[in-house]
Amino acid sequence: MNIQRIFIGALPSQDTRAFRLYWRSSQTDLAGLLLLQRLDIREDLCGGIEGRLSCISTSTGVSLQNFLGQPLTVQMVTDTGALQSICGIVTDAHEGESDGSLATYQLVVRDALSVLERRINTRIFRTKSTLDIIQTLVREWRTRSTTLAATFDIDMSNIDASKYPTREQTLQFDESDANFIRRLCRREGISWFIKAGGQGSSDLTQSPFH
């Protein structure tokens, strides 16, 4: 990926701004490319993350494919001065108007579970519990996508597995993996939420993870 930039002076530093945008450290061409100007992000319990990020750049005509599928971290300064991080994956991107020197871009960001909406399937799971099925689906997606493997996982450490017995068969019928997982969780009374960071320590400004 080679992004040609128009030199009109560097974009302002985001280090002292109320909200900041970070890409994976390996995405060097994206570092400093966009300056976050406005954000509208919604987080739902037993739902997910969906946000729109409005950015400016000194580069016009950047291929939107450079953004799609890329994990990122948005950090916001709270009223106590602490930083709150939200991690997600870019699922859509648009280029807006340009005055010849500055261009505008809008990114749509969602959580990894929402990405699982892209596969619709019909299958039967035999002699598996709800937790087994969820782990199987997540493992399949993390195996087939290096991006997902590096940017999200599921934590079931606070769930008592003994409360969810093995079922003779469980049917997924013409529904996405994400909707199937949500349906199973609601049926079993399992709540979930999306949280930035993994079970191990990591710098979210270098390695977005949720």
Model-derived features with residue positions:
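Amphipathic alpha-helical and helix-coil boundary elements used as assembly
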Residues: 1-210
